[in-house]
From Swiss-Prot:
Membrane topology, record value: Peripheral membrane protein
Keyword ATP-binding recorded: no
Top-rank lineage group of the source organism: Bacteria
Location in the cell: Cell inner membrane
Sorted UniProt keywords: ATP synthesis, Cell inner membrane, Cell membrane, CF(1), Hydrogen ion transport, Ion transport, Membrane, Transport
Record text on subunit structure and interactions: F-type ATPases have 2 components, CF(1) - the catalytic core - and CF(0) - the membrane proton channel. CF(1) has five subunits: alpha(3), beta(3), gamma(1), delta(1), epsilon(1). CF(0) has three main subunits: a, b and c.
Xref: Gene3D superfamilies: 3.40.1380.10, ATP synthase, gamma subunit, helix hairpin domain
Biological processes, Gene Ontology terms: proton motive force-driven plasma membrane ATP synthesis
Family (UniProt): Belongs to the ATPase gamma chain family.
Function, as annotated: Produces ATP from ADP in the presence of a proton gradient across the membrane. The gamma chain is believed to be important in regulating ATPase activity and the flow of protons through the CF(0) complex.
Family matches, as CDD domains: F1-ATPase_gamma (cd12151)
Protein's recorded name: ATP synthase gamma chain
Amino acid sequence: MASLKDLRNRIASVKATQKITKAMQMVAAAKLRRAQNAAENARPYAERMAAVLGNLATNLTPGAETPRLLAGTGADRVHLLVVCTAERGLCGAFNSSIARLARDHARRLVAEGKTVKIICVGKKGYDILRREFRDQIVELIELRGVRQLGFENAEAVTENLLNRFEAGEFDIATLFYSRFRSVIAQVPTAQQIIPAEISPASESAQTDAAYEYEPEEGEILAALLPKNLTVQILRALLENAASEQGARMSAMDSATRNAGEMIKKQTLVYNRTRQAMITKELIEIISGAEAL
C-alpha cells in the first residue's frame, strides 16, 4: 500500500498536469476560431478555381496542346506523396490518422510495383512514416516557426513540387491532409494534385454561358494551373490547421476530465488510508492502556 506521502505527491502531480491540459484546451479553443474561419473562407475560392479550370478544360480548342499539369506525363510509375501533418503532438489521433492513410496508400502502390517518394510537411508525419519508409522520404518541410499560414507557405511547397515535376522525378502527386468538419470530426483526405483532377463543366453550364477567350484556353490553363496547385495546397494547410486545433481541444478536454476523475479516486484512497492509520493508532493506544 502506498504511503500518505506518496499519495499526496501523486495527487499534486495529477493536479499540475490538469492545469497544463486545461490551459492547452483554452489556447486551442482560442486558435480554433481563427483557423476555422480561415479554412471555411478558403473553400469557396478553391472550389471556384477548380470550376473555372473545368470550364476551360472543357472548351479547350481541338488540337491544342494540353498543359502537362493537366495531362500528366503519360506514365504511372513514380508516385509522390505529400503528407501534411502537425509540428506538435497532443492532438489525439490527428497526426496518426493522416499518416495511416498515406501509409496504406504507399503500401498499395509498392504492392503494385510502383516507386513511392514522400515529402512530409510537418514533423509528426515524418516521425511516424520514417519507421517504415525512411528510404522513400525525400524531404521534410517544417512549419514550426510559422505563426499564421499564408499564401507564401503554399507557394514554397508548390515551387518544390513543380521543380521536381519538371525534372521528371515523379508522374503523379497526391496530397494527404485532414478536412475539418467540426471539433470532434476531422476527415483524413487524399487528393491527387498532379496531374490536376478537374471535373469537366456540366452540359448546362456550357449551354448557359458561351465564352470567348483571349488568349486561347490552353494558354490560360497553363498560367492558371500552377496557381490552382498553390490554392489547393493552401486550402489543405488551412484545413489541417483547423483540424489540428479541433483535435487538440477535444483531446485536452478529455485529458482534463480524466485528470479530475483520477484526482477524485486518489483523494478517496488517501482519505481511506489516512482513516485506517488513525484507527490503527487508536487501537494501539487503547490496547496499551488496557495492558497497564
